Amino acid sequence: MKSSEIRSAFLKYFQRNGHEVVASSSLVPADDPTLLFTNAGMNQFKDVFLGKDKRNYDRATTSQKCVRAGGKHNDLENVGYTARHHTFFEMLGNFSFGDYFKREAINYAWEFLTSSDWLNIDKSKLTVTVYASDDESFDIWANEIGVPEERIIRIGDNKGAPYASDNFWQMGDTGPCGPCTEIFYDHGPHIAGGPPGSPDEDGDRFIEIWNVVFMQFNRTADGEMHPLPKPSVDTGMGLERISALMQGVHSNYEIDLFQELLAEASKVLGGASIEEPALRVIADHIRSSSFLIADGVLPENIGRGSVLRRIIRRAARYGNKVGATEPFLHKLVGKLVELMGDAYPELKASQNKIEKTLLLEEEQFAKTLDKGLKLLEHELEQLKGMTIPGKTIFTLYDTYGFPVELTNDIARERSLAMDMDGYEVEMEAQRKRAREAGSFGVDYNAGLNIDVSSEFTGYTELAGSYKALALFAGSDKADALTVGQQGLVVLDKTPFYAESGGQVGDTGVLKTDTGVFVVKDTKKEGAAIVHIGAVSEGEIKVGQTVTAEVDRHKRKATALNHSATHLLHAALRKVLGDHVAQKGSLVDPERLRFDFAHFEPMTQEQIRQVESIVNAQIRANTSVSTEVMGMDAARERGAMALFGEKYGDTVRVLAMGESDFSIELCGGTHVERTGDIGMFVIASEAGTAAGVRRIEALTGQPAENWVQSSDALLRDIAVLVKGNRETAADKVRALIERSRQLEKEVDQVKAKLASSAGSDLAASAVDVKGLKVLAAKLDGVDRKALMDTVDQLKNKLGQAVVLLASVEDGKASIVAGVTKAESAKVKAGDLVKMVAEQLGGKGGGRPDMAQGGGVELGKLDAALASVNAWVEGQLG
């Protein structure tokens, strides 16, 4: 039974049993800072289980794409070396939101697994576990399903604390939780391993295939378990694992999905064996990287993008190990789309983007390796002792993306040790910085306890009278806030826009009969809109009538920039192509910043085109319309949804420009007519990560100011080059070209002088035990010229050791060369190190060529004079 057939059968079975088939959610969790990537089927229903969201169905089934790489759930280093570890996997699941419970859930699982209409697995091969005190589940398995009691195992608190058990599931320290029952397949006594709960349970004999979680309690901060009024069910069965069982193989990499990918990888890599762990790594990583890119993640140095970058580079590194000499990952995408594109249409739609991103990242990695090798070489030249410091290893990895394992390979070649303890100290410090910055480290159940909601009125008004529902001093509720005290204010209604969708929160003032609260920012906390600031006069009390007034100037300026962002997005897609997608934005009163997916820098002509298109839409002065509709209707109208944003069942659709030039889902504040924007100008365009570009732009008065200052600067330049606005650019180009030409001529003169001086020095070489030895100083010569001159002298002298030094900017540069045959006894690296240390510096390199330097110039003559004796000592 093929993997695709198992997936279809699972969804069909539960659909027949009244479940809504829900599409897999994105691998990027929407509006959930606790989670790096979607790693379980229940992630998209988290708010439903917590009672914060309501769906129009109470039972659902999914095939959810998942990634476990980075963060708490990290399988990356095990991938390729075990039978069942993956960075990407599919989780089949069925869910009940207060509908059915234990009896139905257990019966559904058993019927699907064992019925001849479905998977038809031998019942005698199945063993189940239940939580030790879950008598209800035990009774259902034993007396209703008919599983022999000796194959029902009770698992207690086996992790050192109450309710800490393999068979008790918890969302966090507090919140929904409950027992679970797991179904295992017994491969038989000929396979090593014991049953669940036994000392040798980690063997391969008993393999877990399905986990059924019963959410029946709410755990409070005091550790008490309170029954939920509507218990729920969350189940999960890994597609790869059940496919291995159904296809009679013991490794997930032997199932049909992987076998075809492995064969394709072998072909692309010139026939490498599919048994190679390297190919299993590549087959796994092409799945996770491709799906992540399809869901909008791009390689970068922070957050989710850094994990993607690590996955891609790990795959590329393993490709290099089996002979890859050029980028190859992008060549595997077509086969992946062929295998999984029907089940996941977003993969097929993004094929071109995935291929380009992978190719670009592999090319960048090749450059990184080259740069990293040079940096490592430099660090080794400065090394004191035989151990590479942990900080150096960390910097190469963290700043330059240079793999730790590659640093280790080079260390072994040089007989050097690695300070991995120091590396771990640096890594932990980075993790601490990330936690303190709040990157994916927020506790979902922590924060303000706000049990009230606010209505936003700011689309139609910027001021009004409302009621103060709640006050907070820090995270503590307060009855009043007094003068000078910082805090938070929640109103029943408010015209203040809470930060969202890249638009900053409003500022302004809240006034009561007894005081004034200055609002510095506005944010959303659950269903409440929170005004952040401080009391500037008197005091503010709960229950008072509050006159709220938004800073009109800042709101208007922000609206200009937000509306311009929509026009910019549409213009970029028109000029660059439909692959352009928003990756992030910042909209405030001063400017707009827009990050978007694109694979190369924009040309000046493309920037000019985009500016012209946006300004044409501004001059058209068309009205901006908003309409609230269902998500399906919005999609039919062509509205763009933005990466990383969370949308409800109904959405606000914003249309602007001629012939609906731009249609997007947006809850932000905007101009009434495009002409209100006034003017649009792009101030800069640059890259922020591989495949991501950033535009910073201005509108209205700031745009006019920018144009005027740019014009004044151009006039100043024209005067300096004795031209005018029309000829200034050509004159500057001519000056630059002339400067380059003069620099070349200066370098040539320096090289000739060095060569001439070197030729003269050849006569000064001393015979040391049949070897010509020359140590001398050349004035006014840079390091490159020194190296060229050393090569010339080696060729001229024959069997020779040459060391030359020059002084520039208060530092001595040293280059040494030894002819090939003699470098076995006299090593250039050792020679440079000996001389550099006398000058208070460092040096090193290859046996035939090395370089270094020092700062104690007064010792240079003595250091050069010591060379002959040192060489004699090396020759013995």
Curated annotation (Swiss-Prot):
GO terms for biological process: alanyl-tRNA aminoacylation; negative regulation of DNA-templated transcription. InterPro entries: aa-tRNA-synth_II/BPL/LPL (IPR045864), Ala-tRNA-lgiase_IIc (IPR002318), Ala-tRNA-ligase_IIc_anticod-bd (IPR018162), Ala-tRNA-synth_IIc_core (IPR018165), Ala-tRNA-synth_IIc_N (IPR018164), Ala-tRNA_ligase (IPR050058), Ala_tRNA_ligase_euk/bac (IPR023033), DHHA1_dom (IPR003156). Binds 1 zinc ion per subunit. Its main location: cytoplasm. Its EC number is 6.1.1.7. One of its GO terms (cellular component) is cytosol. It is an enzyme of class 6 (ligase). Its cofactor is Zn(2+). Zn(2+) binds at H562, H566, C666, H670. It comes from the Bacteria. GO terms for molecular function: alanine-tRNA ligase activity; aminoacyl-tRNA deacylase activity; ATP binding; tRNA binding; zinc ion binding. Coiled coil: none annotated. It is found in: Cytoplasm. It catalyses: tRNA(Ala) + L-alanine + ATP = L-alanyl-tRNA(Ala) + AMP + diphosphate. Keywords: Aminoacyl-tRNA synthetase, ATP-binding, Cytoplasm, Ligase, Metal-binding, Nucleotide-binding, Protein biosynthesis, RNA-binding, tRNA-binding, Zinc. Pfam families: DHHA1, tRNA-synt_2c, tRNA_SAD. NCBIfam families: alaS. Belongs to the class-II aminoacyl-tRNA synthetase family. PANTHER family: ALANINE--TRNA LIGASE, CYTOPLASMIC, ALANYL-TRNA SYNTHETASE. Consists of three domains; the N-terminal catalytic domain, the editing domain and the C-terminal C-Ala domain. The editing domain removes incorrectly charged amino acids, while the C-Ala domain, along with tRNA(Ala), serves as a bridge to cooperatively bring together the editing and aminoacylation centers thus stimulating deacylation of misacylated tRNAs. This is Alanine--tRNA ligase. It comes from Hahella chejuensis (strain KCTC 2396).
